[in-house]
Amino acid sequence: ENFNFDFPVNQFQTHYEIIQKIKEDYEQTLNLTANLFSLDQLRLIASAMKKAQIIDVYTSAGNINFALNFQFQMQEIGKQVNVPIDEYQQRLIAASSDENHLAIIITFGGRGILSDILPRILHKVKTPIVLISSYDYTFKDFDPDYQLYISPYENHYKKISSFSTRLSILYIL
């Protein structure tokens, strides 16, 4: 039986079955994410993060809280992280960025300004970019400097919730 990442639970299941299905979703997600990891990329990103004076994390909607958690964790070790939330702040911080910043863009498939506008601004000001996305997504006009992949098995337009994607992002951050 194939696991359905879009609808891991249904209304006719018992509480026990729901708990087991969510557990299975999370276990499969962690395994898939670990299998997509490039240790080489991870090493290079860690080095770029250490070198950067400021890290800027760009994301949207449900992933904002993960970015804020990452910001908190990095601040505990003395690293400055910006998490601009609205589009105006994102554009402003991207435009004032430079090669001393490191931009992390988190997007499943590049919706909204994360797909085209911000990457172009960051590329123009020579800010190194880490893209955290599904396996089959990258920028249109150029490649990111670094890329890590999240579990690609959710349909982002037809699903019960982003259980898999959000756990994958949390695991990476």
State where each predicted segment sits:
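HTH-adjacent hinge/linker in prokaryotic transcriptional regulators
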Residues: 1-41
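Glycine-rich phosphate-binding loops that contact phosphosugars or nucleotide phosphates
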Residues: 50-172
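Short, flexible segments with low predicted structural confidence
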Residues: 19-21, 45-46, 93-94
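A ubiquitous structural signal for well-ordered alpha-helices
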Residues: 29, 33, 45-48, 118
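Glycine-rich phosphate/diphosphate-binding loops that line cofactor/substrate pockets in enzymes
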Residues: 40-52
